[in-house]
């Protein structure tokens, strides 16, 4: 469109704004320090569980250096959202088949944690990774 109309935003997302307001209120009620502590605990639990299976966790042993992300694999493999590593691809498919939300970034499996994740979620991911490893070893 010629002219200033090309900058029109269209309809405003009032429902999204109301939902965002309530979400921010909830996060503020929980408190950022509590969220950080919860996510940090989950991150350490996940990283330690995967490391115990000798999976290549980026960043190594858990500690304060970890963020809310746990990545598995070797950095630099393939494109932005793919991997050339057959093992990582196989584990990713196993997680997909069991409805674990994750992504592939630069050859790594990327697991992102937040306040809505639980210790049970982490235990399930670790159990699925162990199941994948044991199935692969038996083949």
Question: Where do the language-model regions lie?
Answer:
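Structural signature of PLP-dependent enzymes
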Residues: 1-48
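Short amphipathic alpha-helical segments
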Residues: 3-5, 66-70, 107-111
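Short alpha-helical functional segments enriched in proximate histidine and acidic residues
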Residues: 26, 49, 53, 132
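Conserved PLP-binding catalytic core of the aspartate aminotransferase-like
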Residues: 32, 40-44, 53-94, 98
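Short, flexible loop/turn segments with low-complexity composition
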Residues: 38, 61, 137-139
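PLP-dependent enzyme catalytic core of the Aspartate aminotransferase-like
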Residues: 80-139
